[in-house]
Amino acid sequence: MTDTDRQAIYLKYYQEPAYRTSETFLKFDLTDGVTEVTARLRVERSATADADAPLRLEGDDLELISVVVNGTLLSGNQFQRDERSLTLFELPETADITVVTRIYPEQNTALEGLYRSGSMYCTQCEAEGFRRITYYQDRPDVLSRFTTTLVADGDRYPVMLANGNLLTDETLADGRRSVTWHDPFPKPSYLFALV
């Protein structure tokens, strides 16, 4: 998104989100050239939202691999996708949504979302950069607890950090390293960080 694409957002047009994402589980499979991001979201419909309210997830420059709602893989006619969003319809009051995307951090010259700087992967999510990582309610009034797993070559990437407290740090059967962080404090997506 360029500066000319950005539009002013006015308080007088504010609408409460139809859904809240209470828990966010992210897995980053970091390899040279491409990163696969699996985002599992626990969402609840807001008490003031209509029963048929859609869930709109923002996303920029993402390659969508799959969408699963409560264990059911959705086909292309069960959601709507455009350049900047993924919209899900007819959701129950609560849902577990899993979205798998591919991103290309080495090609990310916008320096928003996940990008590569020298030999490190970094994130810049403020103000709307998280939508360049995965489809998400990338707005400051949706607060979620984040659990983040990073999987990469531990020799090449000895520093693997994300928000919160370290839960696990292990070597996988293929020799790669898997590190999981959990942040117990709800926060908006623009405060997400990974290095």
Q: What spans do the regions from the language model cover?
A:
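Acidic/His-enriched low-complexity segments
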Residues: M1-V195
